Amino acid sequence: MSYTIQFLPEATDDLTEILGWYKEQPVTDLQKKFITAISTTFKTLEKSPKSYALRFKNVRCAIVKKYPYLIYYWLDDASTTINIVAILHQSRHPKNWKKRI
């Protein structure tokens, strides 16, 4: 069963901020490589959303491979929806996204 991904507005803002930061870096194609990595993570989520561990109550956390970012999300099994709560750097404190739930 495949799930559909929905982003909270704040998660969209997180992603926009991250992409902007990578675009400004002097390394060639860094933003493009990040987009590829996070897109791969989203595809995995759609196919196997329960493959990632629960971090807090009903919130799961997916790691973006090769990048220091975590995707926080919760599932709505009834509507087969993945609700992306936040996309944050691993060094950020959980309080930064917990208030979004």
Locations of regions flagged by a protein language model:
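Arg/Lys-rich, positively charged N-terminal/basic patches that mediate binding to nucleic acids
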Residues: 1-35
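Structural signal for well-ordered, non-membrane alpha-helices
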Residues: 16-19, 39-46
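Short, hydrophobic secondary-structure boundary micro-motifs
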Residues: 31, 53-55, 96
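Basic/aromatic recognition patch in beta-strand/loop cores that engages polyanionic ligands
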Residues: 40, 47-81
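Enriched for short, Lys/Arg-rich terminal
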Residues: 70, 74-101
